A protein has these predicted regions:
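Short loop/turn segments immediately following beta-strands, especially the blade-tip
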Residues: 85-87, 139-151, 197-219, 266-271, ...
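Structural signature of eukaryotic scaffold interfaces centered on beta-propeller domains
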Residues: 56-68, 101-118, 163-178, 235-245, ...
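Loop/turn-rich, solvent-exposed surfaces of beta-rich toroidal or solenoidal domains
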Residues: 223-268
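A short helix->beta-strand "capping" segment at the edge of beta-propeller domains
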Residues: 37-57, 222-228
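Conserved blade-ending motifs and adjacent loop-strand segments that build the rim/top face
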Residues: 271-293
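Beta-strand-rich domains and repeat architectures in extracellular enzymes and scaffolds
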Residues: 48-78
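Surface loop/turn motifs at the tips and blade-to-blade linkers of beta-strand repeat domains
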Residues: 51-58, 94-98, 156-165, 230-235, ...
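Blade-loop segments of beta-propeller domains
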Residues: 87-127
C-alpha cells in the first residue's frame, strides 16, 4: 500500500498500481497499520529553508548529495559536511570512480563507539566494470582524512538490470547490521518502471585479485557473495538518491523535475510504506537525510537542492 501525503488529508491514500483505493490509515498512530508499527510522521508537514544544521544529534545517519556540482553533503553529528569531489582532496577519487548522476555517500563509523574517531565515507557509483564477463557496479569505502591518493576498499556488486542502458543501481547502507542494499531501478527518465532490491552482508564480500582501479585501494577489492534475499518492487522513477532510515529505504525522486516526492520502501515487508508528495519546491539530482528534532522527539527530513549554482537545504517537520 502507498499513502500519499499532500499536506491536507490522509484520505488521499492510494495504491500505486491503481487497482483499488484501499483503507486509509492515520499515520500518527491513532489507527494501527496492517503490516508494521507506524512511524512518527503524519499527513501534515511544514518546511523551512536551512543553511546550517544545529548540533542536535550525535552520529546522525543520513545523506544529502549534489551530484551536479560533484559535492556530497553529509549529515553527521547533527551538522552538514561538504566534501568537494571535483576540486581538492577528493579529486582523484572523483575521476577514478566516475562519481556522477545518482552518486551517493554516507559517513559510516565501523563501530558505534568509534563514531567520532573513525568516520568512513561510503560512495556508491553507477560505473560498471567487467569481471569475468559480468557487469558489476561498485561502491567504495573511504576513511575521512586519508590522502587523495588512497581509498580504503572497493566493493563490487553484480548489476541487477538486463542491460546498462535500461537502468542503474544505487546503494543504501544499514551500518548497525552490516547490511548493504543494492537497489536497481529500470525505466530511466520515464513515468513507469520496475525495481529490484538485493540484500548483502558486508561480511560476505570476498577478496579478488583483478580489481585494478586507480587509485588502488589500500585494503584491496572485494566482490559480493550470494544475496541474503532478493525481491521485486514497484516504484515511481526518477530516483536520484536514497538512504537507509529506520528499516526503510528513503528514495528522493524528481521526475518530471517539478513535483518532487519521497518514496519509503519497507525492507521487512518488501513494499512501499509511504509516499511524501508535493514537496513545495522541485528537487533535481539532490539528496535526502534525517535528523532527530529534540523538541518534537521525531525525525525531521532534510532535503538538499541546487538552485542557480547554490546548494539549499530544506527541513521538513512532521506534525
Amino acid at each position: 500500500m502507498i499513502y500519499k501525503i499532500d499536506g491536507d488529508s490522509i484520505n488521499n491514500a492510494y495504491e500505486l498500481d491503481g487497482d483499488s483505493i484501499g483503507t486509509a490509515y492515520d499515520i500518527d498512530g491513532t489507527v494501527a497499520w496492517t503490516s508494521r508499527p507506524p512511524h512518527a510522521v503524519s499527513d501534515n508537514y511544514t518546511v523551512s529553508l536551512l543553511y546550517d544544521i544545529p548540533d542536535i544529534a550525535s552520529g546522525t545517519q543520513g545523506i544529502a548529495c549534489d551530484s551536479l556540482s560533484q559535492k556530497i553533503a553529509q549529515l553527521y553529528s547533527g551538522k552538514i559536511f561538504m566534501i568537494d569531489l571535483s576540486d581538492g582532496s577528493y579529486t582523484q577519487r572523483a575521476s577514478s570512480f566516475n562519481l556522477g548522476h545518482g552518486s551517493t555517500g554516507q559517513f559510516a563509523p565501523q563501530k558505534a563507539s568509534q563514531a567520532d574517531l573513525y568516520p568512513y565515507l561510503y560512495v556508491s557509483t553507477q560505473s560498471e566494470k567487467s569481471i569475468n564477463d559480468t557487469i558489476y557496479t561498485i561502491f567504495v569505502e573511504v576513511k575521512v582524512g586519508e590522502s587523495s591518493s588512497t581509498i580504503n576498499r572497493a566493493f563490487y556488486v553484480p548489476f541487477d538490470g538486463p542491460e546498462v542502458a535500461d537502468g542503474y543501481t544505487l546503494f543504501a547502507f544499514d551500518f548497525a547490521n552490516s547490511i548493504v542494499y543494492s537497489v536497481y531501478f529500470s525505466g530511466y527518465y520515464t513515468t513507469t518502471g520496475t525495481g529490484k532490491v538485493k540484500v548483502y552482508s558486508l561480511n560476505d564480500f570476498t577478496a579478488f585479485a583483478d580489481g585494478s582501479y586507480s587509485p588502488t585501494p589500500t585494503n584491496g577489492c572485494f566482490v559480493a557473495g550470494n544475496p541474503i534475499e532478493t525481491y521485486d518492487i514497484d516504484f515511481i522513477p526518477e530516483v536520484q538518491t536514497l538512504t537507509f532510515f529506520d528499516g526503510l529505504i528513503a528514495c528522493l525522486c524528481d521526475y518530471p523535475h517539478n513535483n518532487g516526492k519521497v518514496i519509503f520502501l519497507d525492507t521487512e515487508y518488501h513494499d512501499v510504506y509511504l509516499v511524501l508528495d508535493n514537496l513545495t519546491v522541485p528537487f533535481e539530482r539532490e539528496g535526502i537525510g534525517f535528523i532527530l528534532n529534540p523538541s518534537t522527539n521525531k525525525y525531521d527530513m532534510i532535503l538538499s537542492r541546487r538552485s542557480t549554482g547554490v546548494n539549499e537545504y530544506y527541513r521538513y517537520q512532521f506534525s
